[in-house]
UniProtKB/Swiss-Prot annotation:
One of its GO terms (molecular function) is Wnt-protein binding. The FZ domain is involved in binding with Wnt ligands. Soluble frizzled-related proteins (sFRPS) function as modulators of Wnt signaling through direct interaction with Wnts. They have a role in regulating cell growth and differentiation in specific cell types. SFRP4 plays a role in bone morphogenesis. May also act as a regulator of adult uterine morphology and function. May also increase apoptosis during ovulation possibly through modulation of FZ1/FZ4/WNT4 signaling. Has phosphaturic effects by specifically inhibiting sodium-dependent phosphate uptake. This is Secreted frizzled-related protein 4. Residues 292-303 have a biased composition (Basic and acidic residues). Residues 292-346 are annotated as: Disordered. Glycans are attached at N38, N68, N116, N194, N240. It comes from the Eukaryota. It comes from Homo sapiens (Human). Disulfide bonds join C24-C85, C32-C78, C69-C108, C97-C136, C101-C125. InterPro entries: Frizzled/SFRP (IPR015526), Frizzled_dom (IPR020067), Frizzled_dom_sf (IPR036790), Netrin_domain (IPR001134), Netrin_module_non-TIMP (IPR018933), TIMP-like_OB-fold (IPR008993). Residues 19-139 form the FZ domain.
Amino acid sequence: MFLSILVALCLWLHLALGVRGAPCEAVRIPMCRHMPWNITRMPNHLHHSTQENAILAIEQYEELVDVNCSAVLRFFLCAMYAPICTLEFLHDPIKPCKSVCQRARDDCEPLMKMYNHSWPESLACDELPVYDRGVCISPEAIVTDLPEDVKWIDITPDMMVQERPLDVDCKRLSPDRCKCKKVKPTLATYLSKNYSYVIHAKIKAVQRSGCNEVTTVVDVKEIFKSSSPIPRTQVPLITNSSCQCPHILPHQDVLIMCYEWRSRMMLLENCLVEKWRDQLSKRSIQWEERLQEQRRTVQDKKKTAGRTSRSNPPKPKGKPPAPKPASPKKNIKTRSAQKRTNPKRV
């Protein structure tokens, strides 16, 4: 009896720690690979425990998606079968909005009824959240906030990762071909890169879910800057590259400066990862103050320029136009008129 309880307890701890340590995974469902998000978590809203099970289930809707009966059908299906994994909702995947479900159903159900099918009960819209009353996603709600000058990159297999069977193309990739550029921790770098988050973290694990998808799980200790809330727990940093830059290893204590994109924390080539030092963290705070000061200066100059242009209207450029000379015909008429009015005396 005691042994069975101990085994059950160990199994529960293993599952609990496993879920906490690897909350997100790359989307591998073919229908959903071009969605605005590329990481998901299982189980999904239809209780599929793995993406392999979800792939088998979602295939039944491929023909319906191909006929393009609704502009939001693919989005809705992927939000159900491969829900987006975000920092704020690691334990409860976000559901699609009720309005998205209703649009997809109303658009496609007439076509389904022509073939004696109705909208499936598993995709019922009634239990889904309304946009202004709960948390949900819709195509209109997803925006891109990654700076345009940041290179979008893919991920490499040359790291300590959670193993999955590698594709043939993945095995051909060699770590030796990757040359990472060193990003120096200076004020000039900080001002030019304009990072959206700065954290002190410990690297917990690096997990691969394909040759072009790597998730670095870090334990956040301190938050110095963020554009959206970052929980002080284990969070995923997403890289999408054939080369792992900057290169990091598990168990390192580091300061990370990088970008947030679609509510996800990224780990990209121009990001800065340095061994943790108190002095460097103090510098980063000073650099952020300089960045904000620089922004205020630019805004003040724009306001001053706007007030000046309103109070002093622009003067016309160039010399004023010269008066046009009278035409020869008018001069002739004028002289003839003068002759008639003033005849010569004999």
